[in-house]
A protein has these predicted regions:
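Glycine-biased, small-residue-rich flexible motifs in mid-sequence functional cores and linkers
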Residues: 1, 78-363
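Short, positively charged patches
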Residues: 1-139
Length: 363
């Protein structure tokens, strides 16, 4: 493993060139033991870079990294090993080394990236929460995000709340938690999910690393879901990377006057993302079948105890999944006061829940 780590540390050798070398020489050890002449013949290496492989300090640093991570219980994953995320192997610019600590499988049957703005609205928070409640019926699902403020943190939080393993991809060593107010969340994730990075311990926080981190988020997953995003930012970068990797992209639409939905609307308008209104839309599109649950018999028993008007409202909400109060009023022919009263009763009984913008859905 020392030579594998060392290959990722050689100055001037990027991920693509490292893979070219591995394909040519078959192992990292063989690369370091090759002559400067042989190394120079590889495209992207040249004589100056090939000399860097003869720097003994690189191997010493790699050995120190191996010892440090072993002490911390952090797994070091090499590009050629079976434990490396198989979806990421398909991405040309994927790193050759990853550092991982946690219990969630990196090769789960289903993996979704939940991404969005650091400055989410209540609507974005509600949709993230609602989506996770719908995802809890899916077996072998892992949620991936970037542990940032806003939608990222909410995705991790609500995944844990619904007992869904969640992995945070960070842009620095695993000895650092950024932002610092996510330290408690990160500890919970280590117990029920995991933290992943391409950077070894003690690596500094550098702004340039955050956009690079996004390619791992996109590459790890079958699909990326943009909850809220302005027209620029990390979520837009991640979604376009996902398309480049031939992965699905989904986005929640928002009002045209909401800047934090401008990115989502743009992705939908340009046919980069599929429009979704709920997590169920994602499950349907991906053809992921929910596991059997015991919720329906319990709900059916509750529904028989409701009056005729309440049962009608429930039927309307079930048919649409998410429905506006104005549509409920139109189809039920109830007055504003009666409708508000019935909806409140149903919400107090924990059968339905209200969403921002006078929207309602089933719990």
């Amino acid at each position: 493993m020392i030579y594998n780590i060392a290959l990722s540390l050689v100055e001037g050798i990027g991920h693509k060139t490292a893979k070219l070398l591995l394909n040519k020489f078959e192992s990292a050890e063989a690369i370091f033991k090759s002559s400067v002449k042989d190394l120079s013949s590889i495209e992207g290496v040249g004589q100056m870079r090939s000399k860097a492989f003869k720097d003994k300090q690189v191997l010493k640093q790699a050995e120190e990294i191996l010892v440090q991570h072993d002490k911390q219980g952090i797994d070091i994953l090499f590009y050629k090993n079976p434990s490396f995320p198989k979806r990421l192997v398909q991405c040309e610019d994927a790193p050759i080394i990853l550092y991982y600590k946690g219990v969630a499988p990196l090769n789960a049957q289903k993996m979704l990236a939940i991404i969005g703005t650091r400055k989410n609205t209540e609507y974005g928070a509600k949709m993230t929460e609602y989506m996770m409640e719908q995802f809890q019926v899916i077996n072998d699902l892992v949620i991936v995000s970037g542990l940032a403020l806003g939608i990222d943190g909410l995705a991790h939080k609500f995944a844990l709340k619904n007992n869904i393993p969640t992995i945070g991809v960070v842009a620095h060593g695993l000895d650092t938690i950024y932002p610092s107010n996510h330290k408690k969340l990160a500890q919970e994730m280590l117990a029920k999910g995991g933290l992943l990075s391409e950077y070894p311990l003690t690596s500094k926080i550098e702004l340039a690393n955050f956009p690079m981190r996004n390619r791992i988020v996109a590459g790890l997953c079958d699909a990326s879901i943009v909850v809220e995003s302005d027209s620029k930012g990390g979520a837009m970068i991640t979604s376009k990377l996902a398309v480049g990797y031939n992965r699905e992209v989904f986005a929640f639409p928002g009002r045209s006057i909401d800047s934090r939905s401008a990115g989502c609307n743009e992705l939908i308008k340009k046919n980069i993302a599929q429009l979704i209104e709920s997590g169920d839309d994602v499950l349907t599109y991906m053809n992921w079948t929910p596991a059997q649950t015991n919720n329906k018999p319990k709900q059916a028993l509750l529904f028989t105890q409701l009056n005729e008007q309440e049962q009608l409202l429930l039927k309307l909400i079930q048919e649409k999944e998410i429905i506006h109060a104005d549509e409920l009023k139109l189809k039920s022919a109830l007055s504003d006061s009666k409708l508000a009263s019935y909806l409140l009763q149903l919400e107090m009984q924990n059968i339905i829940k209200s969403l921002p913008g006078k929207l309602y859905c089933m719990r």
